[in-house]
């Protein structure tokens, strides 16, 4: 839990001792420990690494979770509160510590620690670490956002999603680290909730499908133990939102894909949200039961504002479902035709409160670039339906094509609020895609924005239809056989989005190459395809 103590608390002398640390990160460093009972803690406390996130001009969230037995429900920790010292320094050797304090790792939050390290200078990099039980954590590198309203030369942001553990290794993250991004934006499917499944697997999930807190903790630990994923957290601050698999496939509010008992599903959602909170460097309030607000903005000086949304927690039921399906607790229909309620203007993807919040943010944002960090593909897309060979269009019920009125509200808001240079970044579809966004009231007019879906870190999508249908769906680019991520580089005049594709996501040492690039021009909405 957050408890950044500005002044360093006095150290009880009877428990003080000085230790010499091993390990490259802290070689030769001396530090003292004031933790009562620290000697009783098991070793290997920092098995899950460290992370930073949600930078502000004067602060950044620092995260770790003490878990000497990371796959155990309690992480192998005693059921007691544990003091954890944190330090922020200007140098990697911690000779110039500028902020420090003691936070408490509480058993009811899985001994996770979220420190709001404040009093920092804007727009610069810092090093941080945690100390507990005579051990030092790995050293992470964080970054503060530029000063509010400051002119900023540039922003480099890598955006990614969908990292199914079983489908590949995390070579993509090694390449992200090499890009030295200011910020990493993760757009959902950080974990997958499925049971271990050997089909197409290069490695297996280590616990059965989670439904309770212990199960979700073990699943996050499985992912977080990966050294390449840890290295990406250690290299730069992240901003995250979730999609469905952080809880369960294709859920909508309180409805699971199987339309099971909503009360049972909300108990599961509460466990999943708590585990998500416990494992991510989020600047949000901890969850209360099955509720956790994660939509928020993040400013990068005068240059950019990210509006990070949650399209799962508050969405209405999927459209065009057969009557009585929910009541009968039968699985939802994921491919739908057109029906009366598809375009019902009252149907919502974000929920009314989040929609109002977004409307206000889009109207008041002072930023030159406005980046909507959302989960999936916004462009209206036709999908094949093997069950219906007729020419009638079919849509995915689970992405924005299943909530067209909600999507058009955002597009119209960009126009009416004169939002400066809007862009949408997304994930979810396990494919790279890029498209112009047009005003729904002037479909033949010039683009009002562009959207970029940045592939998947590992998760697969093998169907040939995605590329076949791409021209008809108006995609300027479509690639679903290559894994990877997107990189956004912007400055005051313009910038680019580059898609980075792995040679083979099933290899830890895979190389990477640019597979597409699009240029952006401030004041001229839309994307411009470049040749690689
Ligand atoms: Fe996914
Ligand atoms: Ca998804």
Model-predicted regions and their roles:
Residues 2-33, 38-532:
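Metal-dependent phosphoester/phosphodiester hydrolase catalytic core
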């Amino acid at each position: 839990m957050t408890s950044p103590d500005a002044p360093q608390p006095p150290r009880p002398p009877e428990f003080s001792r000085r230790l010499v640390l091993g390990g490259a990160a802290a070689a030769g460093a001396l530090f003292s420990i004031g933790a009562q009972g620290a000697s009783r803690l098991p070793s290997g406390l920092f098995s899950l690494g460290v992370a930073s996130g949600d930078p502000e001009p004067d602060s950044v969230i620092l995260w770790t979770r003490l878990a000497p037995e990371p796959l155990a429900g309690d992480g192998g920790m005693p059921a007691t509160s544990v003091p954890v010292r944190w330090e922020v320094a200007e140098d990697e050797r911690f000779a110039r510590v500028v902020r420090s304090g003691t936070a408490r790792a509480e058993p009811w939050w899985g001994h996770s620690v979220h420190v709001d390290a404040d009093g920092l200078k804007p727009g610069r990099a810092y090093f941080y670490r945690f100390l507990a039980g005579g051990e030092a954590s790995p050293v992470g590198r964080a970054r503060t956002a530029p000063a509010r309203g400051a002119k900023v030369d540039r922003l480099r942001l890598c955006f990614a999603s969908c990292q199914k553990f079983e489908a590949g290794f995390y070579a993509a993250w090694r390449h992200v680290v090499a890009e030295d991004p200011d910020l990493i934006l993760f757009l959902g499917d950080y974990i997958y909730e499925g049971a271990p499944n050997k089909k197409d697997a290069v490695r297996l999930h280590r616990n059965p499908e989670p439904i309770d807190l212990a199960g979700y903790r073990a699943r996050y630990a499985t992912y977080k133990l990966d050294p390449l994923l840890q290295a990406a957290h250690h290299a730069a601050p992240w901003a995250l939102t979730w999609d469905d698999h952080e809880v369960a496939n294709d859920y909508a509010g309180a409805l699971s894909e199987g339309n099971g008992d909503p009360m049972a599903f909300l108990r599961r959602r509460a466990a999943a949200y708590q585990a998500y909170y416990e494992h991510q460097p989020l600047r949000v309030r901890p969850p209360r039961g099955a509720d956790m607000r994660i939509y928020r903005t993040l400013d990068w000086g005068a240059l950019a504002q990210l509006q990070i949304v949650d399209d799962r927690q508050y969405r209405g039921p999927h459209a065009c479902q057969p009557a009585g399906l929910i009541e009968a607790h039968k699985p939802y229909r994921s491919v739908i035709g057109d029906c009366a309620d598809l375009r019902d203007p009252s149907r919502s993807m974000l929920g009314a409160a989040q929609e109002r919040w977004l409307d206000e943010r889009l109207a008041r944002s002072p930023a030159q670039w406005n980046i909507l960090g959302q989960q999936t593909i916004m462009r209206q897309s036709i999908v094949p339906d093997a069950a219906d060979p007729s020419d009638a269009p079919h849509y995915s019920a689970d992405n924005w094509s299943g909530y067209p009125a909600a999507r058009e509200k955002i597009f119209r808001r960009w126009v009416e609020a004169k939002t400066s240079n809007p862009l949408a970044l997304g994930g979810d579809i396990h494919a790279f895609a890029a498209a112009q966004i047009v005003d729904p009231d002037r479909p033949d007019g010039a683009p009002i924005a562009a959207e970029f879906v940045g592939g998947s870190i590992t998760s697969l999508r093998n169907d040939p239809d995605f590329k076949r249908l791409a021209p008809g769906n108006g995609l300027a680019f479509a690639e679903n056989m290559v894994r990877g991520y997107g990189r956004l580089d912007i400055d005051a005049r313009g910038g680019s989005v580059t898609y980075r594709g792995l040679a083979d996501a099933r290899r830890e040492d895979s190389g990477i190459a640019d597979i597409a690039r699009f240029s952006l021009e401030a004041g001229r909405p839309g994307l411009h395809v470049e040749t690689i």
